[in-house]
Amino acid sequence: MSRRRRAKKRIICPDSIYDSRLINMLVNRVMKDGKKSLAYKIVYQTMDQIAEKTEQDPIQILEEAVRNTKPLVEVKARRVGGSAYQVPLEVNPERGTVLALQWVLAAARNRSGRSAIAKLTNELIDASKKTGGAIKKRDDVHRMAEANKAFAKFRF
């Protein structure tokens, strides 16, 4: 067991242009090596491209993409008697949002093409339409949890 105190939850401030916490969460995950202004530029240009392509509010597209990608259950490894079981657990909403953003970004980075903006734009639009790599990842996690339903009795 850890002897430290439990870390306090950080309050995520909404961004200045769209006044959305989700945008700020996305920016913090797009950011590499502390280059936050570059991350803001990528995310804002992505939002502009989404608005151009879909002719809808980009915040609604982002929220829809995250809502479609959020997992309901996940599996965690638990050692019981020398063997590790994949135990299915329900995901709390905050962690679901974080996982959805991580999966959307990972799927966008795995896409072919040069521009990070174009890849992220296409992945968010696909996720809002319930297609794309992030949705596939969510379905894989759900399938894994369904397959290991028998080990639900070993909950944490």
UniProtKB/Swiss-Prot annotation:
Xref: InterPro entries: Ribosomal_uS7, Ribosomal_uS7_bac/org-type, Ribosomal_uS7_CS, Ribosomal_uS7_dom, Ribosomal_uS7_dom_sf
Biological process annotations from GO: translation
Subcellular localization: Plastid, Chloroplast
Main localization (coarse): plastid
Pfam families for the chain: Ribosomal_S7 (PF00177)
GO MF annotation terms: rRNA binding; structural constituent of ribosome
GO CC, any one term: small ribosomal subunit
Keywords, alphabetical: Chloroplast, Plastid, Ribonucleoprotein, Ribosomal protein, RNA-binding, rRNA-binding
CDD domains reported in the protein's UniProt record: uS7_Chloroplast (cd14871)
Family: Belongs to the universal ribosomal protein uS7 family.
Known partners and oligomeric status: Part of the 30S ribosomal subunit.
Function comment: One of the primary rRNA binding proteins, it binds directly to 16S rRNA where it nucleates assembly of the head domain of the 30S subunit.
Protein name as annotated: Small ribosomal subunit protein uS7c
